[in-house]
From Swiss-Prot:
Species for this entry: Haemophilus ducreyi (strain 35000HP / ATCC 700724)
GO cellular component labels: cytosol
Keyword Cytoplasm belongs to the record: yes
Cellular compartment(s): Cytoplasm
Binding-site positions, ATP: K622
Gene expressing this chain: leuS
Name used for this protein in its record: Leucine--tRNA ligase
GO molecular function: aminoacyl-tRNA deacylase activity; ATP binding; leucine-tRNA ligase activity
A Pfam short name: tRNA-synt_1_2
Domain of life: Bacteria
Residue ranges annotated as motif 'HIGH' region: 42-52
UniProt enzyme class: ligase
Length: 861
């Protein structure tokens, strides 16, 4: 063993051993309990960032711990390799997306290996490889045959200059990112998967995910958005047309003062035929693509159509408006507006001078100022004919019954969730396996012709997809007749919705999944990833699992038993303002700092001498130039130090503030562990530990060791509070550093302690522990060593500390044998000099004893 801790030499040697011996290869073994630990697979952008490192370190700590407690662990890694950034990078670097992607994968894979993650690299998946997406294409055709896939027109961003579809990310302030042409909304046919058929199950089975964060489940519940209401049909005055609307508040039905339809609603189109102003308003509204998240804050605009609807119960005419806050693809594309009892309807009515009719009264019969705001809570009905006086529940049912009896309404359960649009008019994605014959028949590509291969050797012009601009690519045959292949590609969420299952059998070629392997390993026992994926990836992930179950391939209902959402990694951000008033962000690695005595930054400058503004700790990002390169940190401090800091600096679910001083502290700690083991192994051979021969100090130290083992086991295994586990090991190390190494039993206790410390640290800092384990004389590598188990008898205390009070004030602390009786404790307390002083000449009226914690003498004053 070298005297000096040299991370780079140790880490490269240990990593070579792991790779050569395939130490982490996972093989199905029905005699062992399996454990599948999975971190969300990365997009191969070119470089790992600290967010990746945190995610994967957490996963690796869990995986290594689970191996040590005897589980058969699968921890794979792969690449979510399709996606729009590759197209942009290909144009910018004059290369093909495939070449750029594969080069990035190679680079990032080496970065992962340098960090020492215990992956089974034989299971590596790259989602842009035909052998992967072949089975995705096949499954899509199976869903189509089951009626779970359909095609319909849907709105996209269209650049009229480039004549191409733009992703939302390519629209900047309403204009094309490339040519600055105003973007239009255009309806084109697109493919959808019926996730709505699974809405109820996706919602109700959230209750079974007891080990998922409540925040994620709440976000999914809100996204699925189940509501119970009534669909009401209004007749349009002077025509045979009708207008269905859905409401969850039929109790407010008598307060409807206008109806609002989406700009794309057929009634709006009809009304605009001879109304140029309305036609222009509709055109403008259609071309302003609004994300649902922006609806609440955007300016509400509308225009009357000139049409009137007949209220089914009062017969009154109600104006129909076109409004920019109504979305065609939600509900019926129309809403009934009750300004007195809905804030949005109220604001719109005030703006355009529409009626505000109160029909709900507060339950306490107090008055409400309807000139200021809507009353949106439940209450009692007024101004509602025979329904006056009813509360919400009774009114809901009574009005629904009446509408149903008249044939103008029906109770309905609605979901906010929409079907999943999987078509993308991009190149770098898996081709959709559908064809259209010369007769216009849409058919699936048969299995024998799969995969439909995406050509990789292409030239990107930055405008059109190469498979769309090449008329030859689409040409094919179906049953001997000419046909055209679909030139859209899949949404990249398709690949990441089932990759976790393919990891169980990546070399299986007879089908999508080997059911035996998949059902042995699945569900995933621990999934790790950011909470930003709560309503997209994590929902599709659950949906796909249910599709695979219903296809008879999988037997479980949910893809992952436990979910951990790691917090973001933050770093200091600094900038100066340029002469053109632009903020120039400077990397924190380039900043010279002065701090006050409390550690606060009082001055910051860059190498050019600019005085910098410190904008605080913010998420590491390219835009603020405050990302820290993991590779630089590994080269400077070692992978184990980076891993240790990542796990110690913050609880896993909380944000982590990157502080290089903390990284330096982690390196110093590992140096102390190394030095203590080095000091120990220089001693002559140790005798076996004999618990009966231990003196008081040795017993106390051994007790601390085993208490630490118990705490660390619970913190890592059950609570997943890795930072507190590390803190406990550090506290123990402080005691071990002060412990003598003189007698045989001193050394024996130290041997047991160091064996425990090295094993407890191994999941977090595996390279140094690999080396220290061998230095301690173990023949088998630590990768196959069992987790250290606490000894209950070692934790039993010979003595207990009891706090002694007189009239509630602490007057002494006594040490008593752990088996002392209550009377013995009281006698010892009364004999304590300080306690005796306060009891002298006093009459004790009561003695309150909490065993081995506290004794209180109540005396007459």
């Amino acid at each position: 063993m070298q005297q000096q801790y040299n991370p780079s030499a140790i880490e490269s040697k240990v990593q070579h051993f792991w790779e050569e011996n395939k130490v982490f290869k996972a093989v199905k073994d029905i005699t062992k309990e399996k454990y599948y630990c999975l971190s969300m697979l990365p997009y191969p952008s070119g470089r790992l960032h600290m967010g990746h490192v945190r995610n994967y370190t957490i996963g690796d700590v869990i995986s290594r711990y689970q191996r040590m407690i005897g589980k058969n662990v699968l921890q794979p890694m792969g690449w979510d390799a399709f996606g729009l950034p590759a197209e942009g990078a290909a144009v910018k670097n004059n290369t093909a997306p495939a070449k750029w992607t594969y080069e990035n994968i190679e680079y990032m894979k080496n970065q992962l290996k340098v960090l020492g993650f215990s992956y089974d690299w034989d299971r590596e998946i790259t989602t842009c490889r035909p052998e992967y997406y072949k089975w995705e294409q096949w499954f899509f055709t199976e869903l189509y045959k089951k009626g779970l896939v359909y095609k319909k027109t849907s709105t996209v961003n269209w650049c009229p200059n480039d004549e191409t579809v733009l992703a939302n990310e390519q629209v900047h302030e309403g204009c094309c990112w490339r040519c600055d042409t105003p973007v239009e909304q255009r309806d084109i046919p697109q493919w959808f998967i019926k996730i709505t058929d699974y809405a109820e199950e996706l919602l109700t089975q959230l209750d079974n995910l007891t080990q998922w964060p409540d925040q994620v489940k709440t976000m999914q519940r809100n996204w699925i958005g189940r509501s119970e209401g009534v669909e009401i049909t209004f007749k349009i005055a002077g025509s045979n047309a009708t207008l269905p609307v859905y409401t969850t508040r039929p109790d407010t039905f008598f307060g409807v003062s206008y109806l609002a339809v989406a700009a794309a609603h057929p009634l709006a189109e009809l009304a605009s035929t001879n109304n140029p102003a309305l036609a222009e308003f509709i055109r403008e509204a259609k071309n302003t693509k609004v994300a649902e998240a922006e609806l609440a804050t955007m300016e509400k605009k509308g225009m009357p159509t000139g049409l009137f609807a007949i209220h089914p119960l009062t017969g009154k005419e109600i104006p129909v408006w076109v409004a920019n806050f109504v979305l065609m693809h939600y509900g019926t594309g129309a809403v009934m507006a009750v300004p007195a009892h809905d804030e949005r309807d109220f604001d719109f009515a005030k703006k355009y001078g529409l009626q505000i009719n109160q029909v709900i009264q507060p339950l306490d019969a107090s008055t409400w100022d309807f000139s200021q705001a809507a009353f949106t809570e439940h209450g009692k009905l007024i101004n509602s004919a025979e329904f006056d006086g009813l509360d919400f529940n009774h009114a809901f049912n009574a009005i629904a019954d009446k509408l149903e009896s008249l044939g103008v309404g029906k109770r309905q359960v609605n979901f906010r969730l929409r079907d999943w649009g999987v078509s993308r008019q991009r190149y770098w994605g898996a081709p959709i396996p559908m064809m259209t014959t010369e007769q216009g028949e849409v058919v699936t590509v048969p299995l024998k012709d799969l995969p439909v291969i995406l050509p990789e050797n292409v030239v990107m012009d930055g405008v059109q997809s190469p498979i769309k601009s090449d008329p030859e690519w689409a040409k094919t045959t179906y049953e001997g007749q000419p046909a055209l292949k679909e030139t859209d590609t899949f949404d990249t969420f398709m690949e990441s919705s089932w990759y976790y299952a393919r990891y169980t059998c990546p070399q299986y070629h007879q089908g999508m999944l080997d059911a035996d392997e998949a059902n042995y390993w699945l569900p995933v026992d621990q999934y790790i990833g950011g909470i930003e994926h709560a309503t997209m990836h994590l929902l599709y992930f659950r949906f796909f699992h249910k599709l695979l179950r219903d296809a008879g391939i999988l037997t479980s209902d949910e893809p992952a038993t436990k979910l951990l959402c790691q917090g973001m990694v933050l770093a200091d951000a600094f900038y100066y303002t340029s002469p053109t008033n632009e903020r120039i962000w400077v990397s924190p690695t380039q900043v010279s700092l002065e701090r006050d005595e409390k550690g606060r930054i009082i001055n910051a400058t860059d190498p050019a001498g600019h005085k910098l503004v410190h904008s605080g700790m913010t998420k590491m990002s390219k835009s603020k130039n405050n990302g820290i390169d993991p590779q630089e940190m590994v080269e400077k401090y070692g992978a184990d130090t980076v891993r240790l800091f990542m796990m110690f600096a913050s609880p896993a679910e909380m944000t982590l503030e990157w502080q290089e001083s903390g990284v330096e502290g982690a390196k110093r700690f590992l140096g102390r562990v190394w030095n203590l083991v080095y000091e120990y192994v220089q001693q002559p051979a140790t005798q076996a530990l004999n618990a009966l021969e231990l003196n008081k100090a040795q017993k106390e130290l051994r007790r601390d060791v085993h208490k630490t083992i118990a705490k660390v086991s619970d913190d890592i295994g059950r609570r997943q509070t890795f930072n507190t586990a590390i803190a406990a090991i550090m506290e123990l190390m402080n005691k071990l550093n002060k412990a003598p190494l003189e007698s045989d039993q001193d050394k024996a206790v130290m041997a047991e302690a160091l064996s425990a410390v090295v094993r407890m640290l191994y999941p977090i800092t595996p390279h140094i522990c690999f080396e220290l384990w061998q230095a301690l004389g173990n023949q088998q590598t630590i990768d196959f060593a069992p987790w250290v188990v606490s000894d209950e008898t070692a934790m039993i205390e010979d003595e207990k500390l009891v706090v002694v009070q007189v009239n509630g004030k602490v007057r002494g602390k006594i040490t008593v044998p752990a088996n002392a009786s209550e009377d013995e404790v009281k006698i010892t307390a009364k004999n304590d000099a300080n306690v005796a002083k306060f009891l002298a000449d006093m009459q004790i009226v009561k003695e309150i004893y909490i065993p081995f914690k506290m004794l209180n003498f109540v005396v007459k004053v």
